[in-house]
């Protein structure tokens, strides 16, 4: 029950319905199932919307309507008396928050329109007003609110700013690192610190590798709940724990034993093949068979009796025994077919080889790790201190401040917990541990609502941890008192062809080991409607592979990315879709794993005339030509003796010096000086005192004088003005901004130049001043091989979309092409010199000196890089985590498609036909095989090979060069402009025929367009009505004339000395008033008088307006109340322009006008027009203005592609306002 106050100050009591019990929810589910609605909510959706009083985890598969569920749940909470500001709603992006807010707003407007309860209308209107203040946004945005409000409690000023520019962060980091590095090099433990630096950088002069290590450790720690505690307690966890063979995790031993047993099984399967050759011609066992049987028996025995024969302490001995047993090669050949039986086992043995030696030297690296721990802790504290001094922080800092505020201030934490009725989280699978801690502090322990899908967790590079979701999933399934799991499996997005291939692929690929979740019946996609199950044979998924057997070298290697041939395959399929099926370009989307080869795709599509829009490429802003020219201009202004920058400026279009000019200048040196800069030579050339003054001709001298004069002016400006003004001065004085407008990609180039000025302005506003510091900042960004974000420009809508898989998340497209499926997964991180893990801490490659072990006496040292045990442990986990993320990326990419999905890659047809595995083992691909395959394409081919007897819902097709010729690819069909059959019969001579045609054309034009000669090309509805009304509506004219003559009232003459107010002026004033009138306030005389002051009319006209009549319209008519209820949908005094065809001349003309008011809804439009004409009967004005409203309706329909369902005239010329529907 809720109490509100009405306008009279009286309490309004609203009785809200209680939350539904489990029995009521079941009843609602049954009613929904039996209803005849075309679109029904699923039982699980209803459960997710209405279940309350406990923690809820909604596992929502792709396309299952999770946003719909969230919006409906929020609306249900509001309708049951929970104010919107008592809900905490976290989204992953700002865009998602905006969309969610808009959906809630639309739902509230719809609910207001449906309800007849006035008190409920008032309450819902209040919720609308509170919506903009509600906590709907990202975790970063909420953390900023907390710190802005309560930062004082931990000593943080509320007047902070966010450092979003990575370049600024890098500059500060570099300053802190350099100072700290010097301190550590001069401390007592300097020898240990030098050894630490050398272990990663090779020498103490080049600190880049060590700096990267420190920065990475710092960034990793920032994603934890408490960075300082993690660095102190977890950073060296594995280094302290794993120091003996007995410390090796059981899981790693199990994987080794599993690889041994799998090898024995695969070898047995191979030896059982008919063509293997177990026996010799004499009938005895062959030597090969005997050897392989021995391997099978020993591997099986060692696995079975591992604990008795070896145990963990004897692991090193087991590795030696297995290494000596199996052959050094990977393959066993049968009938010229190679089977990689030993490949996986060799990889596992490599992991465990030299364990005793590694453990012997591993203890020597522990002092180095302690030094690293101290350095990273000191760096974290010093960097934070600098940011506090600057009052500028990163998002992670703000989040940790918010956590600290809530942890250390019980009253603040409890106030939040008591305030929030529910803590709701979208995209829960992408949370990190810092965010999870913040959510835990906001919740009261039983009011969390989490929506996500672990199969779509693809942000590990942002330290997102899918195990947070996974752990909740397991806990809630085992311990129902902690919370409830609800599965949304129905997919409402894709046709069965997409759903079937997705289920087929991931049921063979994804489990807890790789993918972090078993893709079983719980997680498989189910069509949500009957329409999705209708089969389309031409929409079966396709794996299209360019056959690289005869690759002519045009294709780059895997590391380089996609080849021209692969893109041509895509172009061919798109041309076929567009020409044969009429598929518009905007229905087609290309997905890539990275943007590195977008240029090849765009270039190829341009060749075939296919329009394409990309979501950006690599960040190359600072490397764009126009920006480099301007940066060199600024460098020259700062220091003219910078020869590189000066030459670039002289050669630029601003001054246009050519090679000959520069050569002549270069010869003007001073023989007495050993080193002479170009700027000095220019000055000597101008005054004629160079070594060869005769080389400076008049034209060159004039160019030099102009240059020196301009440079002097710029340098003076740099001392007096801001960076922003200086850059704009550079643009315009030498017309460079105008010059780039004439070049290719002019719009992008001009946007880049203007963005440079804006970034300089932002740089100065952040507290830095001066041209020198700005150039230094830019140079540091370039030194760190970073760049600034590219500038976005407007893109065409009717074009194929090209974007990364990450960017496509949450979107859907009819046709999806997944490109570059042959691209190897990036395993760069597992080959670095260090690997971080949240639980185990850091593992490193240690550069050990094994001089003593080898007995070497000649050399000073013998350094060998060793993978320490913590490193190997982290490496294995990271490898599986990387493969899992790639698998989820493939899932996201495939489930974006509505109708059809294509996989594009390249492979050798002959090699791909080799059998991957001799035997199908269970439903999943063997774990060892999934670990071994490192491309989407390899996974798909392995599934197609091993499970070839199943219908996998995708076809594999190899494309040859002969399929990619110009004729085979085809070209886009364009509408034919001329029909050859319509050409004039050529029976007469060409001259006579042309003369007759000209005479006929002139006569026809004069006849057809006679009316157009006397009519304007731009007309208004009033002009149109006056011109054609007698022709189009003669009956209506007669009625009006008769009715006007039958009026019996006679108005007495008015003899006032005041000037008469024209009716048109009153009408204009009424329209102005209706435009500016604030509808959010109650409409009364005071509101009208306040609004009246703001219109542009004289006092006589304002006095002539009947405000009581206007008040009556809003208070006493349903249409007036409609204005106030749906004010968010209202557009007032909207201009329009449409093309019309003149009925007499058949010539097109522009019709312009202004629509008084219209309401724009999702599926229809309501049109309103005010009239102040005097009338006797409303039917008169209805007939008079019917055509005018039809024109307005036509304009709105053309603009929005929606029907105008209602058209109203508001008549203000009578005794009271009247509403007439036309």
Swiss-Prot record:
A UniProt-annotated Pfam family: UvrD-helicase
Binding site for ATP: 60-67
Entries under InterPro entries matching the protein: AddA, DNA_helicase_UvrD-like_C, DNA_helicase_UvrD/REP, P-loop_NTPase, PDDEXK-like_dom_sf, PDDEXK_AddAB-type, Restrct_endonuc-II-like, UvrD-like_ATP-bd
Reported cofactor(s): Mg(2+)
One term of GO molecular function: ATP hydrolysis activity
Keyword Isomerase applies: yes
Reaction(s) catalysed by this chain's protein: Couples ATP hydrolysis with the unwinding of duplex DNA by translocating in the 3'-5' direction; ATP + H2O = ADP + phosphate + H(+)
Any GO CC annotation of this UniProt entry: DNA helicase complex
EC number: 3.1.-.-, 5.6.2.4
Gene Ontology biological process: double-strand break repair via homologous recombination
PANTHER family named in the record: ATP-DEPENDENT HELICASE_NUCLEASE SUBUNIT A, UVRD / RECB / PCRA DNA HELICASE FAMILY MEMBER
Name listed for the protein in its UniProt record: ATP-dependent helicase/nuclease subunit A
Taxonomic lineage from the root: Bacteria, Bacillati, Bacillota, Bacilli, Lactobacillales
Gene name in the database record: addA
């Amino acid at each position: 029950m809720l109490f509100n106050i009405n306008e009279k100050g009286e309490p309004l009591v609203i009785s809200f319905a209680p939350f539904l019990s489990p029995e009521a929810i079941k009843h609602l589910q049954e009613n929904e199932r039996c209803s005849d609605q075309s679109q029904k909510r699923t039982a699980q959706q209803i459960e997710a919307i209405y279940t309350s009083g406990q923690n809820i985890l909604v596992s929502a598969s792709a396309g299952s309507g999770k946003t719909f569920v969230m919006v409906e749940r929020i609306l249900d909470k509001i309708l049951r008396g929970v104010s919107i500001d008592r809900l905490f709603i976290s989204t992953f992006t700002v865009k998602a928050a905006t969309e969610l807010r808009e959906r809630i707003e639309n739902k509230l407007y719809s609910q207001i329109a449906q309800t007849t309860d006035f008190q409920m209308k008032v309450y819902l209107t209040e919720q609308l007003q509170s919506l903009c203040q509600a906590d709907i946004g990202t975790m970063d945005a909420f953390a900023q609110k907390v710190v802005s409000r309560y930062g004082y409690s931990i000593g943080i000023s509320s007047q902070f700013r966010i450092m979003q520019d990575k370049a600024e962060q890098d500059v500060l980091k570099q300053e802190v690192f350099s100072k700290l590095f010097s301190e550590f090099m001069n401390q007592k433990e300097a020898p240990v610190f030098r050894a630490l630096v050398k272990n990663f950088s090779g020498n103490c002069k080049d600190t880049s590798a060590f700096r990267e290590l420190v920065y990475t450790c710092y960034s990793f720690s920032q994603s934890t709940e408490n960075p300082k505690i993690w660095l102190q307690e977890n950073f060296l966890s594995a280094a302290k724990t794993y120091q003996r063979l007995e410390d090796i995790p059981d899981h790693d031993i199990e994987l080794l034993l599993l690889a041994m047993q799998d090898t024995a099984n695969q070898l047995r399967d191979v030896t059982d093949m008919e063509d293997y050759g177990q026996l010799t011609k004499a009938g005895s066992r062959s030597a090969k068979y005997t050897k392989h049987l021995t391997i099978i028996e020993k591997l099986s025995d060692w696995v079975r009796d591992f604990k008795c024969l070896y145990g963990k302490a004897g692991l090193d001995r087991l590795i030696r025994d297995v290494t000596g047993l199996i052959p050094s090669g990977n393959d066993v050949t049968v009938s010229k077919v190679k089977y990689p039986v030993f490949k996986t086992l060799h990889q596992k043995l490599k992991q465990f080889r030299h364990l005793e030696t590694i453990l012997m030297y591993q203890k020597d690296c522990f002092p180095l790790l302690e030094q690293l721990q101290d350095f990273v802790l000191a760096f974290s504290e010093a960097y934070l201190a600098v940011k506090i001094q600057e009052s500028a922080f990163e998002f992670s800092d703000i989040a940790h401040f918010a956590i600290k505020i809530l942890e250390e201030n019980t009253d603040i934490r409890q106030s939040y917990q008591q305030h929030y009725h529910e803590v709701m989280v979208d995209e829960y699978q992408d949370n990190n541990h810092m965010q999870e801690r913040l959510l835990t502090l906001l919740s009261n322990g039983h009011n969390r609502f989490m929506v996500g899908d672990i199969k779509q967790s693809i942000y590990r590079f942002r330290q997102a941890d899918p195990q947070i979701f996974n752990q909740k999933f397991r806990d809630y399934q085992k311990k129902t008192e902690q919370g409830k799991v609800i599965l949304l499996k129905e997919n409402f997005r894709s046709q069965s062809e997409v759903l079937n291939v997705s289920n087929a692929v991931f049921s063979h690929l994804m489990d807890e080991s790789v993918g972090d979740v078993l893709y079983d019946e719980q997680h498989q996609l189910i069509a949500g409607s009957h329409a999705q199950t209708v089969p389309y044979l031409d929409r079966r998924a396709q794996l299209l592979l360019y056959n690289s057997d005869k690759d002519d070298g045009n294709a780059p290697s895997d590391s380089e990315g996609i080849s021209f041939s692969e893109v041509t395959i895509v172009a061919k399929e798109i041309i076929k879709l567009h020409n044969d099926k009429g598929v518009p370009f905007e229905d087609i989307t290309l997905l890539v794993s990275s943007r590195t080869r977008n240029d090849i795709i765009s270039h190829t599509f341009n060749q075939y005339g296919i329009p394409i829009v990309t979501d950006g490429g690599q960040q190359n802003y600072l490397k764009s030509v126009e920006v480099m020219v301007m940066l060199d201009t600024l460098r020259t202004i700062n220091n003219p003796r910078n020869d590189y920058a000066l030459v670039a400026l002289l050669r630029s279009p601003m001054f246009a010096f050519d090679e000959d000019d520069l050569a002549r200048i270069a010869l003007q040196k001073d023989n007495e000086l050993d080193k002479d800069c170009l700027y000095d030579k220019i000055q000597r050339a101008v005054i004629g005192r160079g070594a060869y003054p005769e080389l400076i001709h008049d034209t060159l001298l004039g160019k030099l004088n102009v240059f020196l004069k301009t440079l002097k002016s710029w340098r003076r400006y740099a001392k007096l003005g801001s960076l922003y003004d200086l850059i704009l001065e550079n643009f315009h004085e030498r017309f460079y901004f105008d010059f780039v407008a004439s070049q290719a990609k002019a719009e992008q180039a001009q946007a880049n130049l203007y963005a440079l000025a804006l970034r300089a302005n932002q740089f100065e506003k952040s507290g830095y001043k001066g041209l020198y510091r700005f150039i230094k900042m830019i140079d540091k960004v370039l030194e760190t091989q970073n760049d600034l974000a590219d500038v976005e420009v407007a893109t065409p809508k009717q074009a194929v979309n090209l974007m990364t898989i990450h960017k496509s998340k949450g979107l859907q497209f009819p046709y999806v092409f997944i490109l570059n499926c042959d691209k190897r997964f990036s395993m760069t991180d597992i080959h670095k010199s260090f690997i971080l893990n949240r639980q185990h801490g850091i593992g490193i490659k240690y550069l050990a000196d094994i001089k003593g072990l080898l007995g070497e006496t000649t050399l000073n040292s013998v350094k060998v890089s060793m993978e320490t045990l913590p490193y190997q442990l982290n490496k294995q986990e990271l490898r599986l985590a990387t493969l899992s993320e790639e698998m989820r990326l493939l899932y996201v990419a495939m489930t974006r498609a509505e109708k059809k999905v294509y996989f594009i890659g390249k492979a050798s047809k002959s090699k791909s036909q080799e059998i991957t595995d001799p035997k199908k083992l269970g439903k999943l691909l063997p774990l060892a095989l999934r670990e071994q395959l490192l491309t989407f394409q390899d996974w798909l081919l392995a599934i197609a090979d091993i499970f070839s007897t199943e219908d996998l819902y995708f076809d594999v097709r190899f494309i040859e060069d002969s399929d990619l010729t110009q004729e085979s690819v085809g070209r886009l069909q364009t509408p034919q402009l001329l029909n050859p059959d319509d050409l004039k019969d050529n029976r007469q001579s060409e001259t006579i025929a042309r003369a007759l045609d000209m005479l006929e054309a002139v006569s026809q034009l004069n006849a057809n367009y006679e009316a157009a000669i006397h009519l304007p090309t731009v007309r208004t509805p009033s002009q149109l009505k006056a011109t054609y009304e007698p022709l189009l509506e003669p009956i209506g004219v007669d009625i009006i004339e008769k009715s006007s003559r039958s009026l019996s009232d006679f108005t007495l003459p008015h003899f006032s000395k005041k000037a008469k107010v024209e009716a048109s002026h009153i009408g204009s004033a009424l329209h102005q008033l209706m435009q500016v009138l604030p509808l959010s306030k109650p409409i009364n005389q005071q509101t009208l008088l306040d609004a009246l002051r703001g219109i542009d009319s004289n006092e006589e006209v304002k006095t002539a307006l009947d405000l009581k009549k206007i008040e009556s319209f809003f208070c006493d008519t349903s249409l007036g109340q409609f204005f106030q209820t749906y004010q968010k949908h209202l557009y007032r005094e909207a201009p329009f322009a449409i093309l019309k065809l003149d009925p007499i001349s058949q010539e097109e003309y522009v019709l312009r006008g202004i629509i008084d008011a219209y309401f724009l809804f999702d599926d229809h439009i309501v049109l309103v027009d005010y009239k102040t004409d005097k009338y006797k009967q409303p039917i008169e004005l209805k007939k008079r203005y019917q055509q005018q409203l039809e024109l307005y309706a036509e304009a709105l329909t053309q603009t929005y592609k929606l029907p105008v369902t209602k058209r109203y005239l508001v008549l203000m010329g009578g005794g009271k306002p009247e509403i007439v529907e036309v």
